[in-house]
Amino acid sequence: MDVRDIILRPVITEKSTNLMDDKKYTFDVLLTATKTQVRNAVEEIFDVKVKNVNIMNVRGKDKRVGRYTGKTARRRKAIVTLTNDSNDIKIFQDENKEDNK
């Protein structure tokens, strides 16, 4: 399995953006991914050093549309803590730098 298949997408919420100040980044990962696989994938993709990985399973919520009920998809979320001497992960592009080019 390729390392780019393990990390699905970054989680962009108010809480996760506040955690970025502490070098903690949140990603949605495969349901079968382990902490070791997430660590290796983040280190290889972003060229950083990982200090710690916390993983949680988020269950799907019940949703209704009229009389029809269903569930949203369950997901697995990983919070990756980087070492203090590691570089930051650039999730957001700086618009000012692109305009100056």
From Swiss-Prot:
| GO MF annotations in UniProt | rRNA binding; structural constituent of ribosome
Q: Which UniProt keywords apply?
A: Ribonucleoprotein, Ribosomal protein, RNA-binding, rRNA-binding
Keyword Ribonucleoprotein included in the entry's annotation: yes
Q: Which GO terms describe its cellular component?
A: ribonucleoprotein complex; ribosome
List GO BP terms, alphabetically.
translation
Instruction: Keyword check for Cytoplasm, yes or no.
Output: no
Q: Which Pfam families match?
A: Ribosomal_L23
Q: Which InterPro entries match?
A: Nucleotide-bd_a/b_plait_sf, Ribosomal_uL23-like, Ribosomal_uL23/eL15/eS24_sf, Ribosomal_uL23_CS
Q: Which Gene3D superfamilies match?
A: 3.30.70.330
Q: Which NCBIfam families has this protein been placed in?
A: PRK05738.2-4
Regarding protein family, the annotation reads: Belongs to the universal ribosomal protein uL23 family.
The family database entries (HAMAP family) matched by this protein are listed as: Ribosomal_uL23_B
Briefly, what is this protein's role? One of the early assembly proteins it binds 23S rRNA. One of the proteins that surrounds the polypeptide exit tunnel on the outside of the ribosome. Forms the main docking site for trigger factor binding to the ribosome.
Subunit structure comment from the entry: Part of the 50S ribosomal subunit. Contacts protein L29, and trigger factor when it is bound to the ribosome.
Name-wise, this protein is Large ribosomal subunit protein uL23
Instruction: Tell me the organism.
Output: Lactobacillus helveticus (strain DPC 4571)
Gene symbol here is: rplW
